[in-house]
Amino acid sequence: MLNNAMSVVILAAGKGTRMYSDLPKVLHTLAGKAMVQHVIDAANELGAAHVHLVYGHGGDLLKQALKDDNLNWVLQAEQLGTGHAMQQAAPFFADDEDILMLYGDVPLISVETLQRLRDARPQGGIGLLTVKLDDPTGYGRITRENGKVTGIVEHKDATDEQRQIQEINTGILIANGADMKRWLAKLTNNNAQGEYYITDIIALAYQEGREIVAVHPQRLSEVEGVNNRLQLSRLERVYQSEQAEKLLLAGVMLRDPARFDLRGTLTHGRDVEIDTNVIIEGNVTLGHRVKIGTGCVIKNSVIGDDCEISPYTVVEDANLAAACTIGPFARLRPGAELLEGAHVGNFVEMKKARLGKGSKAGHLTYLGDAEIGDNVNIGAGTITCNYDGANKFKTIIGDDVFVGSDTQLVAPVTVGKGATIAAGTTVTRNVGENALAISRVPQTQKEGWRRPVKKK
């Protein structure tokens, strides 16, 4: 095991023609995150001193999407092969560091596998990640003599005998910086593709008497690349299946693991139940005994113990204390906060609003820029009118207030503790404590009224 510093080169210059997209291939997402970001995260977790990103097509889009300050951007103006890509990055290599080569369209490579590869690299030699396939057609074959790796032959350049070899190159390797620069300088494009192959450094190393150690990944999916949307969708399901399995083994009840998507990180308590077609995005925390109904989307939120989220509810950047109930068909937008035992029912929307302990907003309501006290009843059809076309204003409702149905609260406005708002009221001025506010037009009644008759 070597303890050298290490830098990582990520090849991400390909256009991705078979994706049929204006977006660079490596920016297409897996589990809600760009493929290349998965690789960058692995490199950073591995402790890379520098991450050199070799880019070409769609460079402006890449730079807009990837904000990692640790990235060194390396332009490959012409795509002349993997060896050529590494040659562009070579001036940045330190002689005494390890250089690990990764690919922006191989998103599921694990830190554990890369660490094993790094540990296995012999002094002065190369660590090479390989796999054995039943059908290796199209891949570079690993050639050996007396069990030792001697080189890699690309499929188009291989003889019929070499094409029978099942061990193939994944493209992922690690070597010393000084050695890498020397070997890269010796590459030629004398092959069927007319390209500079990074794989040729294996034969160069062998000719120098250097040892090449092959390591296999834990799972084949770790080294599967993406060239089209079908392959990407398959890797998405592989990834989601792995995440679901981890959650099940950790005690989370997923009613159907095949219909659950995790697009971020999930921290959870005990006895959590998640129904079908639920999507978890960003950083989500679920307390003990949380229940989430079918079709819900939870993003960057904290859900307290004993909360129940009914079907088809969307929760984003929200915070729920214990024993809250939400939905079905509710929407909590950024800044929504529910205190203990609060209830938000169907077709209720909250944004930048706090609902106090035991308070309820049961139906068809919008609460925006609002601070609502404890034990408040918000009647159906209540709207906080928080926007005048230019600025937002706040509504404050004290404890123990009863708001009748079809009420409009025109902010800025304050409703005092214990007040009652009659149904159909438009509140434009502050309401005092324990007062009744009513602004309905007086009802009139005309006896013997006859409806108009349609003219023939």
From Swiss-Prot:
It catalyses: alpha-D-glucosamine 1-phosphate + acetyl-CoA = N-acetyl-alpha-D-glucosamine 1-phosphate + CoA + H(+); N-acetyl-alpha-D-glucosamine 1-phosphate + UTP + H(+) = UDP-N-acetyl-alpha-D-glucosamine + diphosphate. Its main location: cytoplasm. It is an enzyme of class 2 (transferase). Keywords: Acyltransferase, Cell shape, Cell wall biogenesis/degradation, Cytoplasm, Magnesium, Metal-binding, Multifunctional enzyme, Nucleotidyltransferase, Peptidoglycan synthesis, Repeat, Transferase. Pfam families: Hexapep, NTP_transf_3. It is found in: Cytoplasm. Residues 230-250 are annotated as: Linker. Acetyl-CoA binds at residues 380, 386-387, 405, 423, 440. Mg(2+) binds at residues 105, 227. GO terms for molecular function: glucosamine-1-phosphate N-acetyltransferase activity; magnesium ion binding; UDP-N-acetylglucosamine diphosphorylase activity. CDD domains: GT2_GlmU_N_bac (cd02540), LbH_GlmU_C (cd03353). One of its GO terms (biological process) is peptidoglycan biosynthetic process. Its cofactor is Mg(2+). Its EC number is 2.7.7.23, 2.3.1.157. SUPFAM superfamilies: Nucleotide-diphospho-sugar transferases, Trimeric LpxA-like enzymes. GO terms for cellular component: cytoplasm; membrane. Residues 1-229 are annotated as: Pyrophosphorylase. Residues 251-456 are annotated as: N-acetyltransferase. UDP-N-acetyl-alpha-D-glucosamine binds at residues 11-14, 25, 76, 81-82, 103-105, 140, 154, 169, 227, 333, 351, 366, 377. Pathway: Nucleotide-sugar biosynthesis; UDP-N-acetyl-alpha-D-glucosamine biosynthesis; N-acetyl-alpha-D-glucosamine 1-phosphate from alpha-D-glucosamine 6-phosphate (route II): step 2/2; Nucleotide-sugar biosynthesis; UDP-N-acetyl-alpha-D-glucosamine biosynthesis; UDP-N-acetyl-alpha-D-glucosamine from N-acetyl-alpha-D-glucosamine 1-phosphate: step 1/1; Bacterial outer membrane biogenesis; LPS lipid A biosynthesis. The active site is at 363 (proton acceptor). Binds 1 Mg(2+) ion per subunit. Homotrimer. In the N-terminal section; belongs to the N-acetylglucosamine-1-phosphate uridyltransferase family. This is Bifunctional protein GlmU. It comes from Shigella dysenteriae serotype 1 (strain Sd197). The lineage of its organism: Bacteria, Pseudomonadati, Pseudomonadota, Gammaproteobacteria, Enterobacterales.
